[in-house]
């Protein structure tokens, strides 16, 4: 794949999956514009702020004139119903759903021919652990936003989402139960996600839009019941 002279916007691109996506695009010749709250040689500010989004979009267009690919990757806050305040829940939705929506709206007049948006959701958009409501709601929201935008932007921009499962951003190689429990036989790493992002932005994915692709080593496809197929529930006594 060749992304020479393509302009890529990535939210949350300073570390983890976002940084890997940025590096892979750069290797293939793209110009990458990152916004993140973490310090670095990119646009540093808060994605939950409307004026910040407007200034960032203005800077990108003034400098590059157009956008080829928008990758909404920024990580929303994860807190549960016991501890999450109203303000924290709203913040998670602002970063995880409102910012992707508003950046899409701001860039809409400036998307180049063949443009694509990839939203990073999570396998938590379809399954949950206790005390993760803010994150889960944001990830479910962006998965739904994906197919809505795909229809609204039909003929102009393809819009897809990816739902990662367990992705170890330190590239740790796990053995034993952590690996064996995964149908794929291992824990994921950022390249598993970055490679799909590149594919979805390429011409090879030209007939794919409105889709959510779960990359989780098959974990969400397993039926897990105590005593079945070697699975055992061990309940911790409180």
Task: Please tell me what each predicted stretch does.
Residues 161, 176-208, 215-217, 238:
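C-terminal helical subdomain
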Residues 122:
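Residue(s) in the substrate-gating loop at a strand-loop-helix junction
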Residues 73-78, 218:
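Conserved NAD(P)H cofactor-binding loop of Rossmann-fold oxidoreductase domains
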Residues 104, 138, 146:
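Active-site helix of classical SDR
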Residues 209-238:
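Short C-terminal tail/terminal secondary-structure segment
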